[in-house]
Amino acid sequence: MTLRDKRQKEFAEVWLNSKWGILNLCPRFGKIRTTINILKKLKPVHVLIAYPDVKIKESWQDEFRECEYVDGFITYTTHLSLHKYQDYNYDLVVIDEIHLLSEAQIEACKTLLENNDKVLGLTGTLSKSTESTLLSELDLHVAATYTIEQAINEGVIVDYQITVIKVPLDNITVNDYKGKKRTEKKQFDKSIRKIRRKHYVP
């Protein structure tokens, strides 16, 4: 068992203590794997997973396949369609990327949460303002936080590396920039002059 696996199990246990709240776990840590640990313990029959876009749904399905976890009992929905499920009762409600809920979606969640007693919010980028809103509007507290600094220090994730690749601007091919014919380099030079004038840079 890797340290990442161990931490995922630990955070699953933290949430399972109350079966209510938000896990604020840094990007690339494994929020879905943490949730799978929760599902294995709860053994739910009906689960609702809400996500902001289809790419995230695909991530869930990919992880379930990789872990050989059957997801036939799971209802998937977008944040936008949460209102369609607000009157139903589930063994577990998972709201992924909970920090992205709009005001209207939070309103739909109020009814949903009144009808359900096991709610897991997932995020990796939770501002203090959003944390306060989710607590006051939905009574969802942060059950645990694992920052990117902690994950890097423990070697659970690798630090970001940024590589800058410099390429010369094309000064031969003429392009159309809002009706003006210029090369890429001349357009760039013009943009730089404009920025300097705006900010009084000599």
Cite the ranges covered by each PLM segment.
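Conserved strand-helix element at the start of the C-terminal RecA-like helicase core
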Residues: I32, V47-K57, D189-P202
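Conserved RecA-like ASCE ATPase "motif II neighborhood" in helicase/translocase motors
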Residues: F73-T111
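Walker A/P-loop
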Residues: S18-I38
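Post-DEXD/H (motif II) to motif III coupling segment of the RecA-like Helicase ATP-binding lobe
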Residues: L100-Y160
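Conserved pre-motif I regulatory segment
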Residues: M1-N24
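Loop/turn-to-beta-strand initiation segments
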Residues: H46, D71-I74, N89-L92, N116-L120
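Inter-Walker segment of RecA-like/P-loop motor cores
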Residues: A50-N89
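Conserved interdomain linker/interface between the two RecA-like ATPase lobes of SF2 helicase motors
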Residues: V142-P202
